[in-house]
Amino acid sequence: MIYGILSHVPKIFFKPAYDLYERYLLEKVKAGVLPKHVAIIMDGNRRWAKKREKPPWYGHLFGSKKLEEILEWCHELGIRILTVYAFSTENFKRSKEEVERLMQLFEQKFRELVTDKRVHEYGVRVNVIGRKELLPKSVRDAAEEAERATRKYNNYVLNVAIAYGGRSEIVDAVKDIVRDVMDGKLRVEDIDEELLKKYLYVPNMPDPDIVIRTGGEVRISNFLLYQIAYSELFFVDVYFPEFRKIDFLRIIREFQKRERRFGR
């Protein structure tokens, strides 16, 4: 009965309590050990759009806006590295219209990054990781322009995984190592886990402390397979466009309570 009454109360009446709880969580999180690297599988854009009887691109558009919010949250907390899974190699199998819309959105967002005042004010370096040769030339050009425009920055790092697959990344790294062995630049005896890291799409990047997947699915979907061996995994039910700051803070708070053993 009480739930039935509360469900008819306008949400605006709960906002002061919500804001108070968010500030409380923020203070708790800031007082603890913060992750250096957060990775996100941005899942649920299409289902979020379908729930609203909108086409898939509508969900992807709102997903891109959510990513901008998350960048602000990371800046506020001092989380230096954010890696997001935007488009897998398997996603090319989606409908032609959806893929074309997504490519247009990627191109637009990369070009916006070049002139975004926050990117330059915060010192955000942009890396686009994946098999970029699979992307349309206009998207590749826009991605490379964003990388060039931010190459000198090192305060924060945004890795955008597009046309990406974790297995493909490992295969590409192994191919490069084999070439260097054949060219006499490396000895077989030199090959170890640390050397392989130097051949990944972003060489020597610290492994993610946290991996978050939105959308309710409990799987990794070929994301950063080499890098997440000891990452803390969090799966949340909300679709990516609905992912709130309070959800983000709760995850980090839970991360701070866990004992990381790194296989020991």
From Swiss-Prot:
Q: Name one Pfam family in it.
A: Prenyltransf
Residue positions of the active site: 43, 91 (proton acceptor)
Alphabetical list of NCBIfam families matching this protein: uppS
Name of the protein this chain belongs to? Tritrans,polycis-undecaprenyl-diphosphate synthase (geranylgeranyl-diphosphate specific)
Residues annotated for substrate binding in this entry:
44-48, 60, 88-90, 92, 94, 213, 219-221
User: Cofactor: bound how, per the entry note?
Assistant: Binds 2 magnesium ions per subunit.
Q: Looking at the keywords, is NADP present?
A: no
Q: What is its EC number?
A: 2.5.1.89
Q: Where does Mg(2+) bind?
A: 43, 232
Name the catalysed reactions.
Answer: geranylgeranyl diphosphate + 7 isopentenyl diphosphate = tri-trans,hepta-cis-undecaprenyl diphosphate + 7 diphosphate
The cofactors required by this protein are: Mg(2+)
Keyword field = Magnesium, Metal-binding, Transferase
Question: How does the record describe its quaternary structure?
Answer: Homodimer.
| Family per record | Belongs to the UPP synthase family.
Read off the InterPro entries from this record. UPP_synth-like, UPP_synth-like_CS, UPP_synth-like_sf
Decide whether keyword Isomerase is in the record. no
Q: What does this protein do?
A: Catalyzes the sequential condensation of isopentenyl diphosphate (IPP) with geranylgeranyl diphosphate (GGPP) to yield (2Z,6Z,10Z,14Z,18Z,22Z,26Z,30E,34E,38E)-undecaprenyl diphosphate (tritrans,heptacis-UPP). It is probably the precursor of glycosyl carrier lipids.
* Any Gene Ontology biological process: polyprenol biosynthetic process
The organism of origin for this protein: Pyrococcus abyssi (strain GE5 / Orsay)
Per UniProt, what is one GO molecular function of this protein?
magnesium ion binding
